[in-house]
Amino acid sequence: MIIYLTVGDQPSGVFNSQVIDFVNFLAASTSQKVKLVAFISIRGFFSNRRQIQKKCPNAFVLPMLPRIKNWEKNKYLFFASLKLLGLKPSLIMGRNVLATLIALEAKHKGLTNKVLFDGRGAISAEWKEYRVVEDGFLEENIQQWERKAVLEADWRIAVSNKLVDFWNTSFHYKPGNETVIPCTLDQSYERIELSDTQVQAAKERIGLAPDKITLVYSGSTAGWQSGSLLRLLLEELLENQTTLQVLFLSEETATIQSLAAKYPGRIKSRLLPPNEVASFLCGCDYGLLVREQTITNQVAAPVKFAEYLACGLKVLISPNLGDYSELVEKEALGYLSTALPPQLEKMSLTDKTRIQQFALQHFIKQNYLPDYLEIIKQTT
């Protein structure tokens, strides 16, 4: 049996695609019994638990102790739950650092045989660069905790080769016992049909001008999304090319309001539930992925990149964004934000289809099944 353990991850579009979808895929595609154990905030606990169990019926959802600084104490409820339910997993996969540390202690107590660290980013750098937590004790200890997770796990998944490089330079990790698997698509993105009719219908639903070239930003307004850099890029593009319009699929911010006032009729914004985003992305031409030059971003593998491609969009991307900036140049998947052409061209259906096919070849979970099977072989 395999347990996939999360600590502090709340239900969201990312949770659906990177946790629930993964657990369901692994259970359906291998001979292993796979169980999600998720510690979530007590705030909205019951509705969030229902939301998780609706999509992953056998998930075991537990309330976290209040305040992230008490994360380690959740291990007692986890250990007790394993014993009460009679579970003895051969492998615990820990999503990120804190879950992996709890899994390592479970191994020390004989409650599991092996531990896998599912590394989603450079967590110590992220906490420092973006003040993810505001607690001195956590900030002081996260680097040594991350080192322990990286070095003591039996196997590791990294979302990018750049993340493995970070482990090597920061923690003296010797590469060899890891598998690089990028953030993969939610299964709903595997079934998108592209046609001229569908693209036109998507533009009409959002009220976009059909004759203009559409840039889209889809995602959160978190600090690492680098809103100020995005604004500078958009102002330059909108000034230089009057045939451009911009769609924001996010919460409306002061930046969006300011751009809308400065460029009347060329800025649209909508906040959509995750299951509706793809149908609007299909009507666009270029996805925006602009990030600061921080360690957090240099090792990242944002799933938004794969989602843009799956909807047939080229990507305007910052340099040094994980493994993806080089990939964009190599495979003609868009442009670096620092090396744009004089004028952006409207995407043809042929080009959209080519890019979508690239996404389906590189970012669906099924394509990484041999890697997952090898991981299971190495750890169970």
Across the structure, where does each feature detected by a protein language model lie?
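Conserved donor-binding/catalytic core segment of Leloir-type glycosyltransferases
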Residues: 3-5, 209-225, 230-234
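Acceptor-binding helix/loop patch of EC 2.4 sugar-transfer enzymes
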Residues: 7, 63-64, 116-147, 165, ...
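A short, active-site helix/loop in glycosyltransferases that binds the activated sugar's phosphate group
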Residues: 103, 140, 147-177, 185-189, ...
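Nucleotide-activated donor-binding/catalytic signature segment of Leloir-type glycosyltransferases, i.e.
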Residues: 250, 254-281, 286
